[in-house]
Design a protein with these regions (language model features):
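Membrane-embedded alpha-helical bundles that constitute the cytochrome b-like, heme-associated redox core
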Residues: 1-235
Length: 235
C-alpha cells in the first residue's frame, strides 16, 4: 500500500476515494436537512438517532478521518505540482481554454470549504453531539445546552435567523459547488474513467449532482431565514 503515498497516481487515488466518500456523506446530509423543511419533529428524531450513540461516534470519527486525509493529500498534491512546475508557475501565460476555472482554483476553493466547515461545526456539532458526548463521559455540561442538543430545528432557526450567517453559508455553498463540479468528475478520471466519452458524461453528472446538492442546502438556509423574517416579533 506504500504506492498510495509514494506515487503521484497513488495520492490521486486516495484523493479520489476519500472525495467520493465525502460526496456520499453530503448526499445523506442534504437529504437529512430537507426533512427539516417538511417536519420539525421528523428532523429532531433523526438528530436524536444520530446523537452520541456508539454508531454515530464511529461514523463521526470515520468522517473526520476522511476529511483530514482528503485535506492533507490535497495540499500534498498541490505542493508537488508547484514543485514540478518550478519557475514556470511564475511565468505569465494564457490559460488553456480547456482548463476550467474551478480546476485552476481548487486549493482556494478547498480552503473556503474548510473555513465554512469550521463555521458549520461551531454552529451545529459543537452545540448538538459534543454536549451529549461530554455528558456521557461524565464531564460537567450545562443542562440548558444539553436539553437543546437533540433539537436540531432550534439550532437551524437560531443560526439562519442571523443574516451574517446566511451570507457566509451561501458563499460557502457557492465555493462548494465549484469544488464539487470539478472534483467529482476528476475523481472518476483518476480511478480509470478517463476516456473522452465517459469524461464528458461524468462532467455532466458532476454539474447536475453539484447543483442539486448545493441548491437543496441553500434552500434550507433561505427558507429558514425567510421564516425568521415572517416570524419577527410574532413568533
Amino acid at each position: 500500500f506504500m504506492w498510495l503515498s509514494n506515487s503521484s497516481i497513488g495520492r490521486k487515488v486516495v484523493m479520489s476515494v476519500t472525495g467520493i466518500a465525502l460526496v456520499l456523506f453530503l448526499t445523506f446530509h442534504m437529504a437529512m436537512n430537507l426533512v427539516a423543511l417538511v417536519s420539525a419533529n421528523g428532523y429532531n428524531m433523526v438528530c436524536e438517532f444520530l446523537g452520541a450513540n456508539w454508531y454515530a461516534l464511529v461514523a463521526t470519527v470515520g468522517l473526520a478521518a476522511l476529511f483530514i486525509i482528503h485535506i492533507i493529500y490535497a495540499f500534498w498534491l498541490t505542493m508537488q505540482n508547484r514543485k514540478a512546475r518550478g519557475n514556470e508557475r511564475y511565468a505569465v501565460v494564457d490559460k488553456p481554454k480547456t482548463v476550467e476555472w474551478a480546476s485552476q482554483n481548487m486549493l482556494v476553493l478547498g480552503i473556503i470549504v474548510i473555513v465554512g466547515l469550521g463555521l458549520h461545526l461551531v454552529n451545529f456539532w459543537a452545540k448538538m453531539q459534543l454536549p451529549e458526548l461530554m455528558h456521557n463521559m461524565g464531564v460537567h455540561t450545562d443542562m440548558l445546552t444539553l436539553s437543546y442538543a437533540a433539537n436540531g430545528v432550534y439550532h437551524i432557526q437560531n443560526t439562519f435567523s442571523n443574516p451574517v450567517f446566511v451570507v457566509l453559508y451561501l458563499v460557502w455553498l457557492g465555493a462548494l459547488w465549484f469544488h464539487l463540479t470539478h472534483g467529482f468528475w476528476s475523481s472518476m478520471q483518476s480511478l480509470g474513467w478517463n476516456n473522452k466519452v465517459w469524461i464528458n458524461r461524468w462532467k455532466c453528472i458532476s454539474n447536475i449532482y453539484s447543483t442539486i446538492v448545493v441548491v437543496c442546502f441553500a434552500l434550507v438556509v433561505v427558507v429558514f431565514f425567510i421564516k425568521s423574517l415572517m416570524c419577527s416579533g410574532a413568533c
